[in-house]
Amino acid sequence: MWDKKWPIKPEILLNAGNAASNGDDYSDCPDLSLLTTSSDLRNRLLTTTCGTSPATAEASWMAAQLLKEYPDMWPETVRALLIHSASWTPKMLERFKTDDKKSSGKRLLLRTCGYGIPSLEKALWCKNNSVSMVIEGELQPFKKDGSSYKMKEMDLHELPWPSECLMSLGETSVRLRVTLSYFIEPGPGEIGWKDRYRYPSCNLRFDLINNDESVEDFKKRVNIKMRGDDTKDKGDGTSGSDRWYLGTDNRDVGSIHSDFIDSSAIELCNAKHIAVYPVIGWWRERHHLGKYNKKIRYSLIVSIETPETDVDLYTPIVTKIATVIPTN
């Protein structure tokens, strides 16, 4: 049922009441549902609702709050922030992640609960010990080279992490999380359902530099990985997938990808470069449709946080960014 190639659904969970069960079956129960206004105003002003309808309404309200606070934000970023702020409850982990293996327990958790319950406060604001950086970018994934069609662009972003601050934390636990969001153009016709390269116009992926890797080696590895999609050869080197909680097999589906690394602060000191690169889609494979030179927008969110409340990660990051971005 849960074919690993399909997008993650649901993506987030929100409160929508509860159902009553007799052990064999379940049914809606007004006492456990949410109160709302009625469409039949002549007979009753209020009624109850439960299930996906109120959950969708709450998700829409949260998205509206984000746009109210940041009116210039892209839709890709709104979706990314909601998922980036989400987390699983202890009960979700206890029930669904009975097996800690990425291929079974974590996949079951992800396919059942999505990325968890979003936090509007976390989506809206940074804290001293929890900092998120949002990058809105655009790239042209494909190009025509003579009579052939090839991969064209990847983006490399430098992350302004405070090395001295992280080094001073030593073995303190730090979580680095990455979320990449974009929108695809579905493949025309039913042919797209037969091949994963035919339904999406273009897919994107992210990769983080390894601790023992130079920037040049990182760029070469990602470049080979991007071009190697033609032959399914991902090139030399490793993406360090084992350090990610979900791993590439679980997260690299659909058009939004989110994952995190739990590590010591000192091990993340050198995690200062992240790449966004394309993989094959029908824009390139069905070149007779004339879409091979189109561009795709994306939103990339990268955050670091630590449970230590007396740590200030925010100030040195903002200071470093301010020295790079010119002011008018």
Give the predicted meaning of each segment.
Residues 1-56:
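Catalytic-core environment of secreted peptidases
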Residues 8-10, 78, 174:
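Residues that flank catalytic or metal-binding motifs in active/ligand-binding sites
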Residues 103-205:
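Secreted peptidase-domain scaffold signal
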Residues 71-96:
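An often Trp-containing, charged/polar helix-loop segment at the C-terminal end
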Residues 16-20, 88, 184-186:
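Short loop/turn segments at secondary-structure transitions that flank enzyme active sites
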Residues 55-69:
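Short, small-residue alpha-helix embedded
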Residues 173-328:
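Long mid-to-C-terminal assembly/interaction modules of large eukaryotic proteins
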Residues 88-95, 111, 202-210:
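Eukaryote-specific, cytoplasm-facing alpha-helical/coiled-coil scaffolding segments in long proteins
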